[in-house]
Amino acid sequence: QPWREVNPETAGRAEEQMENLVRFLQTRGIVVHRPRPLTEEEEGFLKEYGTFSNQLFPRDSVLVVGNHVIEVSMRMVTRAKENFGLRDLFLRLAAERDCHYVSMPFNLPSGAFEPPRDTGPMLEGGDVAVLGHDILVGINRTTKSATNDGGIRWLQQYLGDAYRVQPVPLTKDILHLDDGFAAVREGLAIIMPEQFAEGLPPLLRDWEFVEVSKWEALNYLAGNGLVLGPNEILIDDRLPHVAEALARHGVTVHTITYDAITPWSGGLRCSHHPIVRELD
């Protein structure tokens, strides 16, 4: 049953906030592509393993790394249907541009209430941070809730020597790396330190940080900002102290109301996926 029928008020607020985000981006000259609605047949894909679907968070189901577009294999297998709404766009862009469009191996599904199990390589976009030719990939080996070691190996093997893929172990309460990590520019990031099970990755140890609490990261998605370019970011307006701290580092900070979206376990980074960046 559609969310807008179950709770019209909260659904309406969420739709309004998403449209406000789109308008903000468009007024800055950014071309925004939207997933198309799923057909009834697509909605029913693997329905025996769960019928829930949404298209709020395109970050997780695809990766764009250089000229590679990768449909990933997610832990919650019913989320695979989300790419049906994006595939026409990526096929068209792949034909227009010099890029490689591939899909990871599809995994054997497991039931929604079964214990997590590894049935193949699994990788989710929320775990992936591309920092030049270094790629950090979060992994929760305790809960096995998203990316696994097979997915990290697959990504390194696919990309080859041009990129260095580095696992980042996460603590048990954390779903994705971007719950508490956002690189605002080279050398500066928003972080929630408690999420790093083995401490900061060596790549980040000389960086400066704006720290957020675990509560802010899990409830407000405080580390989940939308980086518009080096030294410019859009964050949730419930985090004025984060905005002030970033401004002291010379960052241009924009804020937006997003409190009707974050209860679905995603923030501003989750809600978008940059395809092409053109920087001055």
Task: Give, region by region, the residue ranges found by the protein language model.
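The feature marks the mature, well-folded catalytic cores of soluble enzymes
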Residues: 1-280
